Amino acid sequence: MILGLALIPSKSFQEAVDSYRKRYDKQYSRIKPHVTIKAPFEIEDGDLDSVIEQVRARINGIPAVEVHATKASSFKPTNNVIYFKVAKTDDLEELFNRFNGEDFYGEAEHVFVPHFTIAQGLSSQEFEDIFGQVALAGVDHKEIIDELTLLRFDDDEDKWKVIETFKLA
């Protein structure tokens, strides 16, 4: 079973992000807009209850987090992904760190860059065209997210599904 942990924003911000993703993100139908807290990791089916208990224990003392999408940015030249950058806060960093050590299904492969992906799978020309438009349009959205979401990848439907949400203090 493949799981992941994410912060999922309000419906209104999901709609704003999805207005780009529908056009520019081939992964659009697989998952809602989100900030990844724990990248996909694999467990045995019988370990799900244990993972849920570990998540509950690890979020203890973590407050609801402020998410402030500040501008369009990209991972170029590594890859042609465009995203809305989220300002890194101590609370976001702490939440990420609690789930990205050897004691919880391994360390993160990448440094923590909180963001909402809006475009991926682009050719270099597409990237240049789209990035200019998105950067010009800009973004300045702030909200409090008070739940951490545990997701499972459904192979049959080729998409991520919510297993459980956990209230942040």
Curated annotation (Swiss-Prot):
Keyword check for Hydrolase: yes
Coiled-coil residue spans: none
Short sequence motif HXTX 2: positions: 115-118
EC number from the UniProt entry: 3.1.-.-
Domain of life from the UniProt record: Bacteria
Top EC class, one word: hydrolase
GO function terms (MF aspect): hydrolase activity, acting on ester bonds
HAMAP family: 2H_phosphoesterase_YjcG
Family: Belongs to the 2H phosphoesterase superfamily. YjcG family.
Listed name of the protein: Putative phosphoesterase SaurJH9_1013
Organism: Staphylococcus aureus (strain JH9)
